[in-house]
């Protein structure tokens, strides 16, 4: 990573970048929503594309001089369509939350009912949490998981849908280790006349690799982030499998009168000028690069290894007496309920950080602790797999995590963390990342 100019011009920021580079290269990243982009993606994101304003869409901009950023955006859109096998893509959302906001704004009016997975059961803020716009502008109702299994019960989903009759059902999660039955969700939505949105921000990379069920044929809208398992730059995206007339009946004037706008037209207008102005063209260029990478055969090998590593870790944790919510994992993550280990999520996160392992504390279903403490931790394998780690490494990592958690209430905990940190550093240095070396 070439930083010689930054070092000369701004030593304080340079130092922060150096320290973050050391953290990423010499400690173990197990946060399920994080990954490492390629050097090509980073170069695109750090390119002259960052200088260009480009309000509007390719061929229909409000600014001149957009002919080359148009190329980048068209590449991103075309590659995403091929990757997800969809007919419509908007690559301009700055984040997954922005993408979700655009969808909700495009089909709902304030006060309309929505239904999504409860945040404390593994959902996301934008699926109806009362602290988020989605729970403040709309009447939000939440489905959850069964206490006995930790899994979503479609009978419970249907019962709630019939009771509250939402206009939009959201299926997706940020801390749920099983898959979603998109076909069953669509059948429920159709029976009550609701629209269906899939938020696949977490498993998108596994979905395009064919390792999890595809939401595009079943859902009216599909949103995702472009990082996480897709391994691109931080950003969002909206997709549709097919177009249809917008349900709000928004019209547009024509030479002969007016017509109802198609949903894709409404969606584009909701992203810009609805909730955003100028798109981040350097990030869109990075998205285009990442989508090309995900279209290569080796990306499926990567995604398959992500899933294998997660399965091995889940099995190893279970053998050591840990409780995994839902009983295991079918994707890239797992949620550990630490209550039988007499350690809360906050303590575990802090001790593992001290030991060179980055995870995040996370509420578990029916948690009796606050979101700032929690009873669990969330663990994911995308970043470690990008480094080239495999099943044997996964088992070793679980053993190291167990050493730290088991020592949490003992006088030896600091020594244990220090020794584990040394082992983690050695493991990480055995799996270096191309392009992450500092070259001032």
From Swiss-Prot:
Binding site for (6S)-5,6,7,8-tetrahydrofolate: 119, 123-125, 370-372
Swiss-Prot/TrEMBL GO biological process terms: glycine biosynthetic process from serine; tetrahydrofolate interconversion
Swiss-Prot/TrEMBL catalytic activity: (6R)-5,10-methylene-5,6,7,8-tetrahydrofolate + glycine + H2O = (6S)-5,6,7,8-tetrahydrofolate + L-serine
Stored Pfam families: SHMT
Main EC class the enzyme belongs to: transferase
UniProt entry keywords in alphabetical sequence: Amino-acid biosynthesis, Cytoplasm, One-carbon metabolism, Pyridoxal phosphate, Transferase
Major localization listed first in the record, in broad terms: cytoplasm
UniProt-listed Enzyme Commission number(s): 2.1.2.1
Co-factor requirement: pyridoxal 5'-phosphate
Cleaved signal peptide residues: none
GO cellular component: cytosol
Highest taxon in the source lineage: Bacteria
Pathway: One-carbon metabolism; tetrahydrofolate interconversion; Amino-acid biosynthesis; glycine biosynthesis; glycine from L-serine: step 1/1
Cellular localisation: Cytoplasm
Gene Ontology terms, MF aspect: glycine hydroxymethyltransferase activity; pyridoxal phosphate binding
Site (Plays an important role in substrate specificity): 227
Subunit structure: Homodimer.
Function: Catalyzes the reversible interconversion of serine and glycine with tetrahydrofolate (THF) serving as the one-carbon carrier. This reaction serves as the major source of one-carbon groups required for the biosynthesis of purines, thymidylate, methionine, and other important biomolecules. Also exhibits THF-independent aldolase activity toward beta-hydroxyamino acids, producing glycine and aldehydes, via a retro-aldol mechanism.
Protein name, per record: Serine hydroxymethyltransferase
Protein source organism: Chlorobium phaeobacteroides (strain DSM 266 / SMG 266 / 2430)
């Amino acid at each position: 990573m070439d930083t010689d100019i930054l070092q000369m011009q701004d030593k304080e920021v340079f130092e922060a970048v150096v320290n973050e580079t050391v953290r990423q290269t010499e400690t173990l990243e197990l946060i399920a929503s994080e990954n490492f982009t390629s050097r090509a993606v980073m170069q695109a994101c750090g390119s002259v594309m960052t200088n260009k304003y480009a309000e509007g869409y390719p061929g229909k901009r409000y600014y001149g001089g957009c002919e080359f950023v148009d190329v980048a955006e068209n590449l991103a859109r075309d590659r995403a369509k091929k990757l997800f096998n969809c007919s419509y893509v908007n690559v301009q959302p700055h984040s997954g939350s922005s993408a979700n906001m655009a969808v909700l704004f495009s089909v709902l009016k304030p006060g309309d009912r929505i239904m999504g997975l409860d945040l404390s059961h593994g959902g996301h803020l934008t699926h109806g949490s009362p602290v988020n716009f989605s729970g403040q502008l709309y009447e939000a109702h939440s489905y959850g998981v069964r206490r006995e299994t930790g899994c979503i019960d479609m009978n419970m989903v249907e019962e709630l849908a019939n009771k509250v009759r939402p206009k939009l059902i959201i299926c997706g999660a940020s801390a749920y280790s099983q898959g979603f039955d998109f076909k069953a969700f669509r059948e429920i939505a159709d029976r009550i006349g609701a629209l269906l949105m899939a938020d696949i921000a977490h498993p998108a990379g596994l979905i395009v690799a064919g390792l999890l069920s595809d939401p595009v044929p079943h859902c009216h809208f599909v949103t995702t982030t472009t990082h996480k398992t897709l391994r691109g730059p931080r950003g969002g995206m909206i997709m549709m499998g097919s177009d249809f007339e917008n349900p709000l009946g928004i019209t547009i004037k024509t030479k002969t009168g007016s017509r109802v706008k198609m949903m894709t037209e409404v969606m584009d207008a909701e992203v810009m000028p609805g909730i955003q102005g100028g798109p981040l063209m350097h990030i869109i260029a990075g998205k285009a690069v990442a989508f090309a990478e995900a279209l290569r055969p080796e990306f499926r090998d990567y995604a398959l290894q992500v899933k294998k590593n997660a399965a091995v870790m889940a099995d190893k944790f279970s053998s050591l007496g840990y409780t995994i919510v839902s009983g295991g994992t079918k994707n890239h993550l797992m949620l550990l309920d630490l209550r039988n280990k007499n350690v809360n999520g906050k303590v575990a996160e802090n001790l593992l950080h001290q030991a060179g392992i980055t995870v995040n504390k996370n509420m578990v279903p029916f948690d009796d602790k606050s979101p700032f403490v929690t009873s669990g931790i969330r663990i994911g394998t995308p970043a470690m797999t990008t480094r080239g780690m495999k099943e044997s490494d996964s088992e070793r990592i679980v053993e190291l995590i167990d050493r730290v958690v088991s020592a949490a209430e003992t006088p030896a905990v600091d020594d244990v963390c220090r020794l584990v940190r040394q082992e983690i550093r050695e493991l990480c240095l055995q799996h270096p990342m191309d392009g992450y070396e500092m070259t001032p």
